[in-house]
């Protein structure tokens, strides 16, 4: 297992964006990180980014840390995972997670 750092982002104001709670296929056309606030930072162990994302989804829906002030993880939330290779951004989709590619982040 390896250790990951993670940062959870949630929409500042879901009514300001046209993609709150939308699937990634729809949201990626207008996705913009400026619509988000970082709401929690932590560390977690896992074998793969996929297993870590599933652990985080369970943790922040079933057994939230006392100092977590956001809502349960749901569609349109973003998790950034950091490991020794750098970071990757993931969008919580209706069924699983979608990688947010660099070209979308940089437009």
Model-based region annotation:
Residues 1-2, 105-107:
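Short intrinsically disordered terminal tails
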Residues 1-47:
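Extended boundary segments
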Residues 3, 7-11, 53, 90, ...:
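Broad hydrophobic/π-residue packing in well-ordered secondary structure
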Residues 15, 25, 39, 63-65, ...:
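Intrinsic disorder/low-complexity detector
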Residues 33-82:
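Short, conserved turn/kink motifs that form compact alpha/beta structural patches or helix kinks used as
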Residues 69-106:
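Short, compact, well-ordered microdomains
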């Amino acid at each position: 297992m390896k250790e990951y750092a993670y940062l959870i982002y949630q929409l500042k104001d879901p009514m300001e964006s046209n993609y709150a709670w939308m699937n990634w296929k729809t949201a990626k056309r207008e996705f913009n990180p400026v619509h988000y606030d970082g709401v929690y930072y932590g560390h977690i162990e896992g074998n793969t980014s996929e297993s870590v994302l599933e652990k985080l989804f369970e943790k922040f829906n079933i057994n939230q840390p006392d100092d977590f002030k956001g809502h349960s993880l749901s569609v349109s939330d973003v998790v950034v995972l950091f490991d020794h290779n750098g970071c990757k951004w993931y969008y919580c989709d209706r069924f699983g997670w979608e990688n947010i590619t660099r070209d979308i982040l940089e437009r």
